[in-house]
Amino acid sequence: MVAETVAIAVWAMLPAYVPNNVAVLAGGGRPIDGGRTLDKLTDEDGVLYDENRILGDGKTWRGTAFGTAAGVVLALLLNQLQPFVAGTVGVPQFPIAAAVALAFGAMLGDILASFLKRRTGRQRGAAFPGVDQLDFVIVSLALTAIVATGWFLATFTLPVLVAIFVLTPVLHVSTNGLAYAFGLKDEPW
């Protein structure tokens, strides 16, 4: 039972787990924020926001596009494998809306985390415990719940969600450590 729950959790989240890794490999190019800062904006009291970049150089249009595309393509490939796996483990097929929501939601979660990092004075690559490990999960799940509600409710049962929130930080730290060891990342987190 636990093994099947873990298998379903990993399978269902693969389209969200892959995009940020692909973005690291395919990134570069024009930053989403265009190099802009928030220094020209003020709050209702006229106090200037910080002068940090909105997102930073690590969030690019190319990385976002390639990451999202990779997650969607992976979901479509998993759909082809699902009939062979479903006899052993009850893994789901991915409707296109769920595939896009999982993949793009993962990228959006990472972008939002970058925004939060800049607002809290953290530079690119600085650790942000908790946020670094779960940002993409929370946003991808939320977006999927909105655009593919029936599939989300059928797939992400409470035990599957628990498995995701327990496994993801471990997987995140492990894969980032490997990427760092292979010189693909400047920091091991």
Curated annotation (Swiss-Prot):
Recorded catalytic reaction(s): these are: 2,3-bis-O-(geranylgeranyl)-sn-glycerol 1-phosphate + CTP + H(+) = CDP-2,3-bis-O-(geranylgeranyl)-sn-glycerol + diphosphate
Q: Which GO CC annotations does the UniProt entry carry? A: plasma membrane
Tell me where in or outside the cell this protein is found: Cell membrane
GO MF, one annotated term:
CDP-2,3-bis-(O-geranylgeranyl)-sn-glycerol synthase activity
What this chain does, per the entry, is described as:
Catalyzes the formation of CDP-2,3-bis-(O-geranylgeranyl)-sn-glycerol (CDP-archaeol) from 2,3-bis-(O-geranylgeranyl)-sn-glycerol 1-phosphate (DGGGP) and CTP. This reaction is the third ether-bond-formation step in the biosynthesis of archaeal membrane lipids.
Q: Which family does it belong to?
A: Belongs to the CDP-archaeol synthase family.
Name under which the protein is recorded: CDP-archaeol synthase
Source organism of the structure = Natronomonas pharaonis (strain ATCC 35678 / DSM 2160 / CIP 103997 / JCM 8858 / NBRC 14720 / NCIMB 2260 / Gabara)
